[in-house]
Amino acid sequence: MKKAEFGQLPMPVQDYLLYLEAIKGHSELSVIEYASDLRTFFRYLAKEKDLYPPDTPDDQIDLRQINMEFIKTVTLSDAYQFLIYCKNQRGNAEATRARRVIAIRRFFIYLTDNRHLLEENPMKVLDAPKTKKALPKYMTLEEARHLLSVVDGKHKERDYAILTLLLNCGMRLSELVSIDYNDIKSNDTLVITGKGNKER
């Protein structure tokens, strides 16, 4: 999903996405993930609640017609059915379903606590599926040395520097590609802006 497509979402969702970026300070990528998860949820509901026939292709569902009156009809059971649909029909992994739960739950918190558009939050007790925490994969010192020793090619100095940063700092790829010349301080240190706009 692209930010330019936000105008195709229900107006309450559009307002929520603005709130996430302007007030909560979420990154554009995080806001796009919330938008995508909520779009999937409301497309599912549009078919389940008979706004559209069940066989309607997702891209032909006009979500702009979904308003607060429709949202007030959404129940906890609807969310559970949506998660079953995500697992069985969409083949979503536990982590994806857990992320979708967070998006739905936080959207309804916003409607209830921030905007006071709902008297009760139907998603208050919506739990995320348990996800398995995999141990991080790592290289041995010998493997890391070997990797650095085989760097070759036209941009070998650049590639060597990139690999050295990744190996020694444990930064994410997104953090690496977002490094700007101004991030390098006068004392030869580098400030990385990571997930959640946290500097380290």
What are the residue ranges of the model-derived segments?
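Conserved catalytic core of the tyrosine transesterase superfamily
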Residues: 1-200
